[in-house]
Amino acid sequence: MQAINPNWNVPKNIHAFTTTREGGVSLAPYLSFNLGDHVGDNKSAVKTNRTLLVEKFGLPQTPIFLTQTHSTRVIQLPYSGQNLEADAVYTNVPNQVCVVMTADCLPVLFTTTSGNEVAATHAGWRGLCDGVLEETVKYFQAKPEDIIAWFGPAIGPKAFQVGIDVVEKFVVVDEKAKLAFQPDAIEEGKYLSNLYQIATQRLNNLGITQIYGGNHCTFNEKEKFFSYRRDNQTGRMASVIWFE
């Protein structure tokens, strides 16, 4: 069972990774380590996969799985409420596991140079545009220069085609965003979007410059990752972080 481990410089008490599609029990089209229970997969298979997630990767607890809605809502752990509709999760308590699920959208994991705060954010283009990264960072006590971010596997800039409407939504918020869109050479009126670049711009605007990752493409790495845009009916990876 493999995982993608961040290539970042963080304290040794930080545990973080993104799962791949390999090593689970789900059948096609969710082959095989699908962790999403909202995508049409067999519920028993998903339950087994979630148990494997805890056991194989040494999680200190069974995590809360958010009901992700492309919002900017953040939940702070430990959380005793009933409303799990959110797209980011933060904690400053040891062994509280933060998890988001993705299959093209950008997962961003956060920690600090002191290693006593962590967060996980699901940044689809809507949430990214609306400010889900900014809302996550608001929870941190650390100064921006002490916050560290890692971009997990997302759809890459050669595969994420959007219309002019999406371009305009981003540019209204930050004019620099236009640098992250290139006209599609094949289809007129369409653009190729770089989520990693936009997320970097947004974090830089907050004063966060310690940024890692952003070197995978879920769409093109079919053997390793689920991709909603490629397959439509598919599973979800998990991006996970906690501190001891």
UniProtKB/Swiss-Prot annotation:
One of its GO terms (molecular function) is oxidoreductase activity. Its EC number is 2.4.2.1, 3.5.4.4, 2.4.2.28. It comes from the Bacteria. Its cofactor is Cu(2+); Zn(2+). It catalyses: adenosine + phosphate = alpha-D-ribose 1-phosphate + adenine; S-methyl-5'-thioadenosine + phosphate = 5-(methylsulfanyl)-alpha-D-ribose 1-phosphate + adenine; inosine + phosphate = alpha-D-ribose 1-phosphate + hypoxanthine; adenosine + H2O + H(+) = inosine + NH4(+). Belongs to the purine nucleoside phosphorylase YfiH/LACC1 family. It comes from Haemophilus influenzae (strain ATCC 51907 / DSM 11121 / KW20 / Rd). Homodimer. Keywords: Copper, Hydrolase, Metal-binding, Oxidoreductase, Transferase, Zinc. This is Purine nucleoside phosphorylase HI_0175. Zn(2+) binds at H70, C105, H122. Purine nucleoside enzyme that catalyzes the phosphorolysis of adenosine and inosine nucleosides, yielding D-ribose 1-phosphate and the respective free bases, adenine and hypoxanthine. Also catalyzes the phosphorolysis of S-methyl-5'-thioadenosine into adenine and S-methyl-5-thio-alpha-D-ribose 1-phosphate. Also has adenosine deaminase activity. The keyword Metal-binding applies. InterPro entries: Cu_polyphenol_OxRdtase, Cu_polyphenol_OxRdtase_sf, Cytotoxic_necrot_fac-like_cat. Coiled coil: none annotated. The keyword 4Fe-4S does not apply.
